[in-house]
Amino acid sequence: MFNFHTYSVDEVPCLLNVDTADILPSYPEHVKLSIGLHPWKVDESWQKCIAMIRKGASREDVWAIGECGLDKVHRETLPLQMEAFRAQIILAEEVQKPMIIHCVRAFDELLMLRRELETTCGKEGREPQPWIIHGFRGKPEQAKQMMTKGMLLSFGHQYNLETIRFVFTSSRPFYLETDDLHLSIRHIYEQVAHHLDVDVSRLSLLCDPRTSLFCRHA
């Protein structure tokens, strides 16, 4: 059982989202990190934040860049969000680590940036790093659109039942998370296992990013 995106240290293996200002010298062995600039926190000083993230991005226990992305609820900072997100895309490619994506009402822009990255990587003869959209609640059609562009999905407590069934039958990796909720990740695994009519043990194997996304760390 793996908690793919959380803001608090879990008892099970997890990917802990940390602020670079609060990052500790070390963490328990089962805790791995993701670091990035959340779109809600983007302001005129975003470049300083990216510089701090860059310093920590090469740590062995940092497995992903993020969460980062775009959020049109905070439309007033969207131009800055785009700049900060592009900078983190470049960083993720440099350190060869996946990205944890926060996307709210900005999927067209997200797809545009993914196409830009695919074009750049194609010219260089390499594959882009995976992007994982966390807390995905979209419909199956939107999920298919994202997956076609090489993106993966992570689901929290709330999700579209048809979508998670579609992803399950697609044989593509997907992940489960608590995000910032004070819930047990086991509760989410049990809920999803019930909806998919599978054993929790099987679901735990299917949703373990160490065997699909972070293979080099396993």
Q: Predicted regions span which residues?
A:
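Mid-domain alpha/beta scaffold segments of enzyme catalytic cores
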Residues: M1-A218
